[in-house]
């Protein structure tokens, strides 16, 4: 007879969600760096001003999420801008 493993403890779930959050922040670091470099170079930017603002809002939501009362519930993960997912 197979038995399902127990669900993760609250501490384990929080660690899992922090790792997910950290990975999402790391995955967007390059976009932020590229945009800033393009601005400093005076060249056309890959992201529009609106996209960059949305990206920074998303990153702020990721950083603030662990302080939110809904952390670490997966259903309440910050949502990435749709253009970033595509």
Q: What feature does the model see in each segment?
A:
Residues 1-86:
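A preference for well-ordered globular domain cores
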């Amino acid at each position: 007879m197979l038995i399902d493993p127990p669900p993760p403890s609250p501490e384990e779930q929080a660690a899992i969600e922090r790792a997910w959050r950290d990975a999402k922040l790391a995955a967007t670091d390059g976009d932020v760096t590229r945009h800033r470099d393009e601005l400093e170079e005076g060249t056309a930017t890959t992201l529009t001003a609106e996209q960059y603002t949305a990206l920074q809002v998303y990153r702020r939501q990721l950083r603030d999420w662990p302080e939110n009362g809904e952390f670490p519930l997966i259903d309440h993960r910050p949502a990435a801008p749709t253009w970033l997912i595509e």
